[in-house]
């Protein structure tokens, strides 16, 4: 009789210690958490996974295609001599739009309502910026004659193309790549309506690059060289630029 009494007391304590509404409260709380996570595009298949996520402090995940869509766009341009950063029909605008169009391997697909990008996302973003400036990149690319080209590589961190330019009537060498690399290969900077030696502008450009990097922005530097008639020097030697006289245009 004493054993039965002890057993009944133990069962009573267990039942009383768990509030009647606790299971329902926990279930409702987890269900609301699932609903909130779903609104942020996080689908939870099992309810108790919400509790696990709530206790998580670090998540290791792939970025491209998971957290991002592998699509880029130009946030800001800083071509030093370009007024209001809008392209026109002047020589500088011609250099910029032809350089972006020809010194690239990306394409835009206009067959659907939403423009699709093909190729390198960074180069495609530049073409989208041109399109936003009402410039036909394909027409510019087809009208120019590409004479030689160094495609981009992660080792040298730049791309270069020599074209026979119908806009300028001369051969032009266009270079784009990591700003610090392109700047190091340039002899002057087109700024404030004139050209100044790189040494006079280097500190300001490096400060600007640091500001962009602190905002987690990817940056590109642009430069060009007009090749005078009769000058048949070899600018590409063993897959690298050689003996150039570049003018730095700015940063995107």
Regions found by a protein language model. Name each.
Residues 1-252:
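Conserved cytosolic headpiece of P-type ATPases
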